[in-house]
Amino acid sequence: FDIYVHNDRVYLVEVKSHADIEDVEWFYKRAEIYEKIRGRRPDKLVLVAVHIDEDAYERAKELGIEVIYGAIIP
């Protein structure tokens, strides 16, 4: 993932051409690791994907990950 900091706010951004549920879970896990190392929770998690599986999209919503996508694959 990439880290974007602006006005003391931290955003973690993951960019994928195709995101599946494993990608979502791994991104969330890495965000937890970031929090443990830095002692600070990211202000926002953002997943950008051209295509995302429907179950991955639903899981991202459950985890509070903002998703920017081109198409949801059923």
Question: What kind of feature is each model-predicted range?
Answer:
Residues 1-23, 27-32:
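Conserved catalytic cores of phosphodiester-cleaving nucleases, focusing on short active-site segments
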Residues 33-41, 62:
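Arginine/glycine-rich "motif VI" loop of SF2 helicases in the C-terminal RecA-like domain
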Residues 8-9, 40-43:
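Short glycine-/polar-rich loops that comprise or flank the Walker A/P-loop
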Residues 44-74:
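Domain-level recognition of nuclease-like catalytic cores that cleave nucleotide substrates
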